[in-house]
Amino acid sequence: MDLEAKVKKMGLGHEQGFGAPCLKCKEKCEGFELHFWRKICRNCKCGQEEHDVLLSSEEDRKVGKLFEDTKYTTLIAKLKSDGIPMYKRNVMILTNPVPAKKNVSINTVTYEWAPPVQNQALARQYMQMLPKEKQPVAGSEGAQYRKKQLAKQLPEHDQDPSKCHELSPKEVKEMEQFVKKYKNEALGVGDVKLPSEMDAQAPNRICIPGGDRSTTAAVGAMEAKSGEHRRTQYSCYGCKLSMKEGDPAVYAERAGYNKLWHPACFICSTCCELLVDMIYFWKNGKLYCGRHYCDSEKPRCAGCDELIFSNEYTQAENQNWHLKHFCCFDCDNILAGEIYVMVNEKPVCKPCYVKNHAVVCQGCHNAIDPEVQRVTYNNFSWHASTECFLCSCCSKCLIGQKFMPVEGMVFCSVECKKMMS
């Protein structure tokens, strides 16, 4: 398929998750409706990951595509119908022992993902070392956390040009080259083993108590000198604390097998969240999730959340924007050359600010223009004018004067306050 055909085929899948309730806004949201080019709900402005959207098959397709053409093809399977790679995530079902009684159902726990190791006891131990609220037990807070992190850490528009908004053929080609590069140089999947099992991969590795966490040395000479076998001590590359030899450790092949992490320490160095399904990106001695690795390589548009492959883009408010996406967050009108106000780190045009966000003056009860000076006390505001910031009793102008606030009213003196009480 040529580039022109690829560009024409692109779309954002606006029916996906349509009407799903927002877990954050509850009844305030009418249901999920994807914005035309922003990756948010048009109704409540929250992301799709904040909505109760059933996306297990879609997420498996996304991760499957990520692993396509990599050394991790054993983690995917291609559907016979369309050849699309699907992620073969390891689901673990544990049966808890219960007293043998009649009419008692078996107590089972299903993990929506577990490390793909043959030793189920090791996988179970790995799970127990994660914070309880992050253990992906089906139907739990942890399962919701995993789903949210899959969407956040591995956005499909960071790997698939067809999920982006109106890329040019040149941008499509650049993105494909970028994806190929990070698959070859940075992408990896953690491996869970006991620390002692890794001695075969790193036979000359020792950790000296009180020394550097990844100190290496030739053991043979030391043992010949001392004549004693010294027990290896292991420390976590993340928290630097010691690790128990019988506890599972996470290894990252791209980092080298002289580094290991506690399960709960295998996190992105930027957002500090658990690396979902142990999928990591390695760069300059640090672990990253997919999103923050890409952020370290390319500018990201604060409007559409996509990486910017164009040579021309704008910077405003310490953020990057596609030229066509520097728009009002409320009405989508382009803001180039226009007055705007930042509301929750999002640009809003002046008319929308006055209509939807401006505070109301306690004096005249009109919205306060963003360019006009105002007086604010607690949650109350006034125009900083002789017509509005007045004593609620005698109408004396209080600009530059001491005043007594009482439930949205202001007084110039105790006498005036008593007269209004």
Swiss-Prot record:
What gene is it encoded by?
TES
Note the subunit structure: Interacts via LIM domain 1 with ZYX. Interacts (via LIM domain 3) with ENAH and VASP. Interacts with ALKBH4, talin, actin, alpha-actinin, GRIP1 and PXN. Interacts (via LIM domain 2) with ACTL7A (via N-terminus). Heterodimer with ACTL7A; the heterodimer interacts with ENAH to form a heterotrimer.
Q: Which UniProt keywords apply?
A: Cell junction, Cytoplasm, LIM domain, Metal-binding, Repeat, Zinc
* Pfam families assigned: LIM, PET
Chief location of this protein within or outside the cell = cytoplasm
What the entry says about domains is: The N-terminal and the C-terminal halves of the protein can associate with each other, thereby hindering interactions with ZYX.
State whether keyword Calcium applies.
no
Family according to the record: Belongs to the prickle / espinas / testin family.
The residue ranges flagged as biased composition, category Basic and acidic residues, are 154-165
Subcellular localization: Cytoplasm; Cell junction, Focal adhesion
Provide the residue span(s) of the region labelled Disordered: 135-165
Domain LIM zinc-binding, chain residue ranges per copy: 234-297, 299-359, 362-421
One GO BP annotation of this record? negative regulation of cell population proliferation
One GO CC annotation, please? protein-containing complex
Name recorded for this polypeptide: Testin
User: Which SMART domains does this one have?
Assistant: LIM (SM00132)
